[in-house]
């Protein structure tokens, strides 16, 4: 039985995996072209998928640029920080530009009150919760500024997790990577 490419596209779209799956299709075409000849993707679907993959690539370039700019801005204001989750995780992909980007999560060193005050000095009405505060959308990219990278609902486990973050923060705040082609 052949691959139902439309079904794969629908699944990949729902799971935010269009870019990654398109990378696989490109590899399939290079490494096993006879498979694609036996079970071809329709031209219209292929063009749609290719277009989505390019949109994902461009969005990654934009989010990388915003993350780098935000990181530099916070450092200039004397705040140590690191990018969490999304764009940092993308570096683990064979092609970081194939991951569908979302918002930027950035961990800023310091007490929650200090970080909240800093963000509210820029945008007074931002909402804060236990582990992060919203930051004004920057060039169309949503940003969350974390004073705690994450949390657990069980207070005993959460205390242990926060102690762990305290132990590793020096390593995290001093780690540098390149996002994109900067």
Task: Report each predicted region and the residues it spans.
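Conserved NTP-donor binding/palm subdomain of two-metal-ion nucleotidyltransferases/polymerases, i.e.
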Residues: 1-102, 107-182
């Amino acid at each position: 039985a052949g691959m139902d490419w439309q079904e794969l596209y629908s699944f990949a779209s729902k799971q935010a995996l269009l870019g990654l799956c398109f990378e696989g299709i490109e590899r399939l075409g290079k490494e096993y072209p006879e498979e694609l000849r036996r079970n071809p993707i329709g031209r219209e679907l292929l063009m749609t998928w290719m277009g989505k993959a390019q949109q994902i690539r461009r969005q990654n370039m934009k989010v990388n640029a915003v993350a780098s700019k935000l990181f530099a801005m916070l450092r200039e204001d004397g705040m140590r920080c690191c990018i969490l989750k999304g764009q940092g995780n993308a570096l683990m992909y064979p092609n970081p530009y194939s991951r569908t980007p979302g918002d930027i999560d950035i961990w800023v060193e310091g007490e929650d009150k200090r970080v909240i005050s800093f963000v509210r000095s820029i945008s007074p009405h931002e909402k804060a919760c236990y582990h992060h505060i919203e930051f004004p959308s920057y060039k169309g990219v949503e940003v969350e500024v974390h004073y705690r990278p994450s949390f657990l609902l069980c207070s005993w486990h959460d205390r242990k997790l926060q102690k762990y973050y305290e132990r590793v923060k020096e390593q995290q705040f001093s780690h540098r990577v390149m996002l994109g082609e900067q």
